[in-house]
Regions:
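Canonical Rossmann dinucleotide-binding motif of NAD(H)/NADP(H)-dependent dehydrogenases/reductases
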Residues: 31-74
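Structural signature of the Rossmann-like NAD(P)-dependent dehydrogenase/reductase core
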Residues: 50-51, 125-128, 173-185, 224-225
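Rossmann-fold cofactor-recognition segment
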Residues: 90-106
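Conserved mid-core segment of classical short-chain dehydrogenase/reductases
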Residues: 110, 128-145, 168-175, 194-197
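A short, exposed helix-loop element centered on a Lys and neighboring polar residues
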Residues: 159-160
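Catalytic loop of short-chain dehydrogenase/reductase
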Residues: 171-210, 214-217, 230
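SDR active-site lid
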Residues: 207, 211-269
Length: 294
């Protein structure tokens, strides 16, 4: 009686805001409290699927999730015969298992869902195809089709194959399915003309993620959208800083899961875009257009 507490604001499984009273001083293993876990998507004790091993952020994501207590991390790998820089680093992580997955191939997605669908508690869709360019600078629609195949249709294939099983496992206790994470570009909210076609594919993915969130709402599985600015990779090299390191992206994602957030903006550019988008989408559009003209 009379002890001071701190109030935290969280979302319940229906997406409604609730207040929870916690001790002023953090208790040992506080994050393991069942009531608190019901209000978060904490990766501790849970099994995670990362969809694209070839994305430069895959190793950082897997490492951060394991450090946060994930019991297993499955990492999807397309065309395993084709080498990529971080394969050895991924294989060296205890708790990581590389699995065959190509998000552009419906059969590949369905086969993995049939084998692992009942084991995935958190799905992180980091599959991405990005190339610079808009409309007139490209001679055909080849890259645009690749961007849509991975960034939009890839998410749809994954959702059609994995979402039903995850929705059916949202009340399985410690190992319940809790979160579906979409890694989106901040340019899903406003087009960057220098990456106009990529922006368009992410805008489509953003809209699809909102549809998925609505469909999953009754199950209690949270759809989390991570909006990120330009990252430190080969395709964003021509852009000026600031850029988001993979380690920062991974850290912010884990924090978002632990806090049970629905939307998180990573990096100064993403946060600036969000602020300006909330103030005036048209002014933000004009600003992006003027930057392209410089």
């Amino acid at each position: 009686m009379g002890d001071e507490v701190q109030l935290i604001n969280r979302l319940d499984k229906s997406g409604q805001s609730v207040l929870l009273a916690l001790p002023m001083e953090r208790a040992q293993l506080q994050e393991d409290d069942m009531q608190l876990r019901e209000l978060t998507c904490d990766p501790k004790f849970r099994r995670v699927l990362i969809t694209d091993a070839r994305n430069p952020n895959a190793h950082a994501l897997a490492k951060s999730l394991l450090e946060a207590g994930a019991s297993a991390v499955f990492v999807g790998e397309a065309e395993s015969w084709r080498p990529y820089p971080d394969r050895a680093k991924l294989e060296s992580l205890q708790g990581v298992e590389l699995v065959s997955l190509d998000v552009t191939d419906t059969s590949s997605v369905q086969e993995l869902a049939g084998e692992f669908g009942g084991k995935v508690d958190i799905l992180i869709n980091n599959a991405r195809f990005v190339r610079p360019g808009g409309i007139q600078g490209r001679g055909d629609v080849g890259f645009a089709m690749d961007e849509m195949q991975v960034n939009y249709f890839g998410m749809m294939r994954l959702a059609q194959a994995f979402a039903p099983a995850m929705a059916g496992r949202s009340a399985d206790g410690v190992n319940s399915a809790v979160a579906w994470v979409n890694m989106l570009s901040a340019y899903s909210l406003v087009s960057n003309p220098g990456f106009g076609s990529f922006s368009a594919s992410n805008a489509a993915a953003h809209s699809l993620s909102q549809c998925l969130r609505a469909e999953m709402a009754s199950s209690g599985v949270r759809v989390v959208n991570v909006y990120c600015g330009p990252t430190e990779d080969e395709w964003h090299q021509p852009l000026p800083p600031p850029k988001v390191p993979a380690s920062t992206l991974a850290r912010e994602l884990v924090k978002a899961l632990q806090a049970g957030l629905e939307d998180v903006y990573v990096g100064d550019i993403a946060k600036d875009i969000r602020r300006k988008f909330m103030e005036s989408p048209k002014v933000l559009e004009k600003e992006m257009t003027s930057l392209e003209a410089l």
